[in-house]
Amino acid sequence: MAEITKADVVSFIENMTVLELSELVKELEEKFGVSAAAPVAVAAAAAPAAAAEAAEEKTEFDIILKSAGANKIGVIKVVRALTGLGLKEAKDLVDGAPKSVKTGVSKEEAEDAKKQLVESGAEVEIK
């Protein structure tokens, strides 16, 4: 069996579409339990103050679709409207529940999205 080199992997990735790359990143994040978001550098003196502020109130929320419920088609429509995904991608997201629908959104946006998803029959969690 031939050994795959780094050059082979880079060549393969170069030929992927943006959508395929996005899906690959999401899969890698889930597989290894990491985030592709750039880490934020904080000055050592400001770290305790920033940690205290973060403990007071969370500003970014993740919308997690736990299950689609009985009205799967309605949930897919709402997921498409919220995320801008295509039909196949939205269906795959709904079929693969529990999955993150949106990440790093404001509390208002998270609550609004949860309301829309619950009204369509989905079971949703905000983290």
Curated annotation (Swiss-Prot):
Residues 101-127 are annotated as: Disordered. GO terms for biological process: translation. One of its GO terms (cellular component) is cytosolic large ribosomal subunit. One of its GO terms (molecular function) is mRNA binding. It holds the Pfam family Ribosomal_L12. This is Large ribosomal subunit protein bL12. InterPro entries: Ribosomal_bL12, Ribosomal_bL12_C, Ribosomal_bL12_C/ClpS-like, Ribosomal_bL12_oligo, Ribosomal_bL12_oligo_N_sf. Belongs to the bacterial ribosomal protein bL12 family. Homodimer. Part of the ribosomal stalk of the 50S ribosomal subunit. Forms a multimeric L10(L12)X complex, where L10 forms an elongated spine to which 2 to 4 L12 dimers bind in a sequential fashion. Binds GTP-bound translation factors. The keyword Ribosomal protein applies. Transmembrane segments: none annotated. It comes from Geobacter metallireducens (strain ATCC 53774 / DSM 7210 / GS-15). Keywords: Ribonucleoprotein, Ribosomal protein. CDD domains: Ribosomal_L7_L12 (cd00387). SUPFAM superfamilies: ClpS-like, Ribosomal protein L7/12, oligomerisation (N-terminal) domain. Forms part of the ribosomal stalk which helps the ribosome interact with GTP-bound translation factors. Is thus essential for accurate translation.
